[in-house]
Regions:
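A short acidic, helix-capping loop that chelates divalent metal ions and anchors anionic groups
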Residues: 13-17, 145-146, 176
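Phosphate- and divalent-cation-binding pockets in alpha/beta enzyme and binding domains
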Residues: 56-59, 145, 178
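Conserved nucleotide-sugar donor-binding
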Residues: 131-145, 182
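Nucleotide and nucleotide-moiety/phosphate-recognizing core
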Residues: 1-132, 164-170
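Internal, well-ordered alpha-helical segments in soluble enzyme and binding-protein domains
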Residues: 109, 134, 142, 152-156, ...
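Short, glycine/charged-rich beta-strand-loop motifs at protein surfaces that mediate ligand recognition
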Residues: 100, 143-150
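A residue-level structural signature of the nucleotidyltransferase/glycosyltransferase Rossmann-like core
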Residues: 102, 134-137, 176-177
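Conserved alpha/beta core of the MobA/IspD/sugar-nucleotide pyrophosphorylase nucleotidyltransferase superfamily
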Residues: 148-183
């Protein structure tokens, strides 16, 4: 069973607002779109990890079938959010970890990643025209190692750099561009 972990706790200093509260010019919420992508992509359960702007973001998610948690030490960076999200999940063989600041990642990307393989040993990530990106698919057996190496804003990056994993090409579906500024 693949679960979804959506990391949306960032303060968004370069954005000028918490990333969980960012909207496209047409009003589309990045938070809601990303949570929907995990659901539509085949995750059986989705947990959204909040931090900055948590009260407003949680209200936006009130009608969405997701679990919402607030990372207690979200200011420590992505690693704190990842730790909170994976720690919340008691079941499931693997988790698709997605970030709020990837506005063009769709359910099709998530589905393709899940279709590449699931299970407790899976380790895969989306790539865009050969460049590794997000989301990342982490089998449960990898969670302790990922969390042991996660510090500050470095989530699974160091673990993935030292462990064989599958790159799942998704460049035909999205760019995977991480948007840190609206300028």
């Amino acid at each position: 069973m693949a679960l979804g972990v959506h990391l949306a706790a960032g303060e968004g200093k370069r954005m000028g607002q918490p990333k969980a509260l960012v909207r496209d010019p047409d009003g589309t919420s990045w938070l809601l779109r990303a949570a929907a992508a995990l659901d539509q992509g085949g995750c059986e359960r989705v947990v959204v990890v909040l931090g900055a702007g948590a009260d407003e973001a949680e209200a936006m998610l009130a009608s969405v079938p997701v679990d919402v948690i607030v990372a207690p030490n979200w200011k420590a960076g992505m690693s704190a959010s990842l730790r909170a999200g994976l720690g919340f999940l008691a079941d499931g063989d693997c988790a698709v970890v997605s970030l709020v600041d990837l506005p063009d990642v769709t359910g099709e990307v998530v589905r393709r990643l899940i279709e590449s393989g699931t299970g407790r040993d899976v380790l895969a990530r989306a790539s865009y025209d050969g460049v590794a990106g997000h989301p990342v698919l982490l089998g449960r057996h990898h969670w302790p190692g990922v969390l042991a190496g996660a510090t500050g804003d470095r989530g699974a990056r160091d673990y993935l750099a030292t462990h064989d994993h599958v790159l799942v090409e998704c460049g035909d579906l999205a760019t995977g561009v991480d948007v840190d500024s609206l300028a």
